[in-house]
């Protein structure tokens, strides 16, 4: 989302909102960046939080951004999860993070995603590595480390690069 810097981000947000698509996990200021998406379906309240890494699979946020995207390691994430847990039936984390082209998640990411569960998340869905990294059940909750490539415009035709995993979630209060 930040490949074209702040102007690209700003333009993307404005265009999505112009056609009625709600954005979350990125923004033009810190309030927008850490604003979750709240959805109600069949009387069930779902809180969605989107986070991203600094880059290159490193579990480190080495900058303090006033705009951009919600940082996966920000201390705000744990507090946001706990806050949503008090007002939502389900809390789902969408994470764009991890080391690209590795079939197993780094131990640091496994630990962080488990922390999200410890803080109250009900489901963690990872993306970014471009390959499937599998799933794990932790404290009765599911963590998907990377769903692979649903679509990626690339000349790479290896099976790992062109394979993705879809998930269907059933939510209940």
Protein language model regions, located:
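Acidic, metal/ion-coordinating pockets
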Residues: 1-173
């Amino acid at each position: 989302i930040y490949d074209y810097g702040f102007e690209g981000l700003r333009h993307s947000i404005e265009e999505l909102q112009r056609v009625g698509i709600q954005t979350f996990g990125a923004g033009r200021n810190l309030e927008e960046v850490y604003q979750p998406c709240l959805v109600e379906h069949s009387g069930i309240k779902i809180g969605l939080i989107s986070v991203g890494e600094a880059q290159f699979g490193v579990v480190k946020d080495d900058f303090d951004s006033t705009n951009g995207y919600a940082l996966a390691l920000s201390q705000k994430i744990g507090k946001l999860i706990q806050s949503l847990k008090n007002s939502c039936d389900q809390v789902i984390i969408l994470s764009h993070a991890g080391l690209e082209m590795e079939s197993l998640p780094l131990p640091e990411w496994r630990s962080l995603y488990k922390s999200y569960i410890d803080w109250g998340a009900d489901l963690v869905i990872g993306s970014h590595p471009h390959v499937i990294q599998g799933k794990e059940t932790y404290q009765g909750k599911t963590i998907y480390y990377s769903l692979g490539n649903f679509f990626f415009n690339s000349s790479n035709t290896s099976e790992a690069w062109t394979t993705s995993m879809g998930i269907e979630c059933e939510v209940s209060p």
